[in-house]
Amino acid sequence: MKKRFNLRHALVLCKRNLIKLTRTPEQLIDVTLQPIIFLTLFLFVFGGAIAHGSRHEYLQFLLPGLIGQTIAMSSISIGQNMNADIAKGVFDRFRSLPIGRSVPLVGAVLADFFRYLLLCVIMVGFGYILGFRITTSPLLLLAALGISICFALSFAWVSLWVGMTVRTAGAVQGVMFLLIFPLSFGSNAFVQASTMPGWLQAFVNVNPLSHLVSAVRGLLLGGPVAAQIGWTFAWIIGLLVVFFPLAMRGYIRRT
């Protein structure tokens, strides 16, 4: 019964966060304009050089990589928003309510589901306009979007932990950039790992974003994906196991 009430309360706070998004739509820039800008930038500025002139081939390679990179980048905002809410005393009011301690954070993550879904749809749709083509099936497209969103939701707990740990919302962005940039550019999102030095390839091969990107590429373009999907879900579970309790501990300490 308690779990049922906690879920209901989390859904109520999810609705609260969605209402905030409708009132401040500029918060959606990172999941609407950012994917379009990144895809255009990498395809038309760097694509010719990286793919030796074949932008279409590079687009096929690039788009799954950018899905992974942009969902990681878009996770920054949830940590910033939670940090700002704590500074405003919003969570002091929540403490007076008969709700579970994890409910405010879970509600925020549930609301982010819709942001990540919007990001993935925009990325695939804009990619299609530019010439990206799925060579598998609509069912595998849904699987690719599903695994991407699951990874994003688990990675959001990293951002929440940072948001509970640092003092200001601006610091959240700085810390998350330091984390996401090595994961993004030290992965196979933009170039093949085989073109990198051996020491960097070792990092790429264990990078969670590399496993996600490889899984999405296989689901959208074909090829063996079972191992990469398995590694991706292992990372999803690992991130939740580690960062959910860390974020909760930070939340309890701050409030």
For the regions a protein language model found, what residue spans apply to each?
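Short alpha-helical transmembrane interface motifs in multi-pass membrane proteins
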Residues: 26-27, 60, 69-76, 106-108, ...
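Pore- or pathway-lining transmembrane helices of multi-pass membrane proteins that form conduits
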Residues: 29-35, 167-187
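Short cytosolic juxtamembrane segments of multi-pass membrane proteins
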Residues: 249-255
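Transmembrane helix-loop junction
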Residues: 43-48, 84, 93, 97, ...
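Membrane-interfacial helix-loop-helix junctions in multi-pass membrane proteins
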Residues: 20, 51-53, 133, 184-241
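Aromatic- and glycine-rich beta-strand/loop motifs that create alpha-glucan
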Residues: 1-34
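Hydrophobic alpha-helical transmembrane segments of multi-pass membrane transport proteins
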Residues: 37-42, 58-130, 151, 155-159, ...
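Alpha-helical transmembrane segments and their short interhelical loops
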Residues: 101-176, 223-248
